[in-house]
Amino acid sequence: MTASISSMAASSVRISNLHKSYGKVQVLKGIDMQVEPGEVVCLIGPSGSGKSTLLRCVNLLEEPNDGTIMVGDTEVTDPDVDINRVRTHMGMVFQQFNLFGHLNILDNCTIAQIKVLGRSKAEAEAVALEQLAKVGLEGKEDRFPAQLSGGQQQRVAIARALSMNPDLMLFDEPTSALDPEMVGEVLSIMRNLADEGMTMIVVTHEMAFAREVADKVVFMADGVVVEEGPSDQVIGNPQHERTQAFLARVLDPTHAVVD
């Protein structure tokens, strides 16, 4: 099976009985999860719960040991899938920006368009400039990553991902490496994407963002889904003791965040 634009267009995600181990250490223990087109799903939970591993399995940056992942009509876990083609329909934003330091901002946002999508340089630059303007970086296309703040670099990473016209965006703790005063500018961009109907899976410790923006919150611990549901329900009125304990520590300023 190979991915095609039409089969990916639904941008839904179906994860069934997903298992992932590193040696004898089980990181994911039978995860089931659904993301509908246009939904924002936030994954929350303590460090070591498997959130980032689950996210990285969606585009096979990590290969699961068992289970299935469907993105649209494409089974990502099919051994015959053209994963590189599938990935062209998914954008991913990492904690550490992962920009090319030797390229200016414009080139960072055009290189994949040209090499992967086959766009002309002129077309790629037009798309990149549009996306850079969208994230508030108009006029900074000639600068290099080292000349930007952390928040600006992360916004470049988002613009770079959006320049590929993805059907699905994956965010792996996109604000965790930022100074506190820079977090808001990145979350604002993500709010705008949600308002535009982008399908998003977000690993985050930003509970206010999750409660405000997420259609669904999934609380994970020890490699399993402990609780999931609408954000107001899971964050505002959690039913499971493990979720209650985690949120009490995260939301109570007198306690250290579990991270």
Regions found by a protein language model. Give the residues of each.
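ABC-family P-loop ATPase nucleotide-binding domain
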Residues: 1-19, 254-259
